[in-house]
């Protein structure tokens, strides 16, 4: 892949499995990495990988014994991992998994999840299609209040976990809160910014996403596209950056903004000290002028 940057991958191996990783790569139009992985990678190719990271898991000490999993699209993967782990280890937990997908063709792992729901009495699974094929007789629509009440009428007794596209994520979380579920009983997986950051509320209208600025770091000056994060600009130039979540939370990729203007995407958890001294998270910061940064 040459100078292709590192990319976060959805792992689906149960936590107790050892010795290998399984990954799921969703095809994205004009994707930076997905096209290469899906169309060019061959059996026997080697990759350098960091270890899995993240905290989107069920916690037996703090979470309720009953779980409500709300999944959208390819974000079914963390739930598949947790479902396998809970069921095959014999844990005393009750799971309801509601999976929203456009159609059957893109509903990955549907057959396995259907089989598991028949084998294990403590696991209920329901697929909901928003653009169902003609003749489909299952549930249609979205993961809304009607669906939740129908398949998890005891939702107040459950810890809810949400993972999916940003729109679905916000919709489901707002729905659960309006239904009376407490914030402490909702766990959600954080994702990076929108594929088109220029459509995010707050983006300066005078800046075109394809506009190219200059980014100075040390003795190097590289191109930085307005619609791509500073992190991606650095990675495209072959400059390695410590990075983990790529969602504006962990701060591992933070840099100091010396000169220039940036757009800070929604969801960046910037510490007060970082804000005071000019540090930003490069994964959620987008150039709006020529820039100079320091590591």
Provide a role label for each language-model segment.
Residues 51-63:
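A short, basic/flexible loop-to-alpha-helix module at the beginning of a structural domain
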Residues 67-77:
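Short, glycine-rich nucleotide/cofactor-binding loops
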């Amino acid at each position: 892949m040459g100078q292709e940057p590192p990319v976060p991958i959805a792992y689906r191996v149960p936590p107790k499995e050892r010795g290998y990783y399984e990954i799921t790569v969703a095809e994205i139009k004009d994707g930076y990495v997905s096209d290469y992985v899906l169309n060019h990678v061959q059996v026997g190719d080697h990759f350098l990988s960091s270890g899995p990271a993240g905290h989107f898991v069920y916690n037996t000490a703090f979470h309720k014994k009953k779980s409500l999993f709300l999944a959208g699209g390819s974000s079914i993967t963390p739930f598949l991992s947790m479902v396998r782990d809970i069921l095959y280890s014999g844990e005393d937990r009750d799971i309801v998994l509601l999976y929203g997908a456009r159609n059957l063709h893109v509903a990955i792992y549907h057959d396995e999840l259907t089989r598991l729901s028949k084998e294990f009495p403590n696991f209920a699974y329901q697929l909901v299609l928003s653009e169902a094929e003609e003749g489909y007789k299952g549930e249609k629509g979205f993961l809304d209040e009607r669906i939740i009440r129908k398949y998890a009428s005891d939702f107040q007794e459950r810890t809810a976990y949400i993972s999916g596209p940003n729109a679905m994520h916000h919709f489901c979380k707002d729905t659960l809160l309006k239904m009376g579920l407490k914030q402490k009983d909702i766990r959600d997986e954080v994702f990076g910014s929108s594929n088109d950051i220029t459509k995010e509320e707050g983006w300066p209208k005078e800046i075109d996403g394809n506009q190219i600025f200059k980014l100075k770091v040390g003795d190097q000056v590289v191109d930085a596209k307005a619609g791509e994060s500073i992190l991606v600009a650095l990675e495209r130039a072959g400059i390695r950056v410590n990075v983990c979540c790529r969602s504006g939370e962990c701060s591992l990729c933070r840099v100091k903004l010396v000169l220039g203007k940036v757009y800070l995407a929604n969801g960046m958890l910037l510490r007060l000290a970082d804000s005071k001294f000019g540090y930003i998270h490069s994964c959620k910061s987008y150039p709006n002028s020529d820039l100079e940064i320091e590591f």
